[in-house]
Amino acid sequence: MAGKELKQCQQQADEVTEIMLNNFDKVLERHGKLAELEQRSDQLLDMSSAFSKTTKTLAQQKRWENIRCRVYLGLAVAVGLLIILIVLLVVFLPSGGDSSKP
């Protein structure tokens, strides 16, 4: 009887050992996956930083482009108004000649 109980205890100990080894393998596998996830998250962080820098640079370029466009438009309007003013002055101001004297 003692031999049977000893055999049963040994079998249970072997089962526990096998379960513990399986758990250890799972822990190692999980550690590998966590390391991979950490590496991927670091890469994503680097990529997001680069993206943020690029968007700030692009926004600044677009802002200056918009300002430049407004300046050109303002200059075009000013030149157009100046031309209209010169034409009106030439047409409506009396000329230096005495064409109105009898």
Swiss-Prot record:
Positions in the Vesicular compartment: 94-102
Phosphoserine found at: S41, S48, S49
UniProt xrefs under InterPro entries: Synaptobrevin-like (IPR001388), Synaptobrevin/VAMP (IPR016444), V_SNARE_CC (IPR042855), Vamp5 (IPR042166), VAMP5_R-SNARE (IPR042581)
TM helices/strands, residue ranges: 73-93
One example of a Gene Ontology biological process annotation: skeletal muscle tissue development
Tissue specificity remark: Preferentially expressed in the skeletal muscle and heart, detected at lower levels in several other tissues but not in the brain.
Entry's localization field: Cell membrane; Endomembrane system; Golgi apparatus, trans-Golgi network membrane
PROSITE patterns: SYNAPTOBREVIN, V_SNARE
Keywords: Cell membrane, Coiled coil, Developmental protein, Differentiation, Golgi apparatus, Membrane, Myogenesis, Phosphoprotein, Transmembrane, Transmembrane helix
Domain v-SNARE coiled-coil homology: 5-65
A UniProt-annotated Pfam family: Synaptobrevin
Statement: the UniProt record of this protein carries the keyword Cell membrane: yes
Top-level taxon in the UniProt lineage: Eukaryota
Family per similarity comment: Belongs to the synaptobrevin family.
The name this protein goes by in its record: Vesicle-associated membrane protein 5
Organism field: Mus musculus (Mouse)
Gene that this polypeptide is encoded by: Vamp5
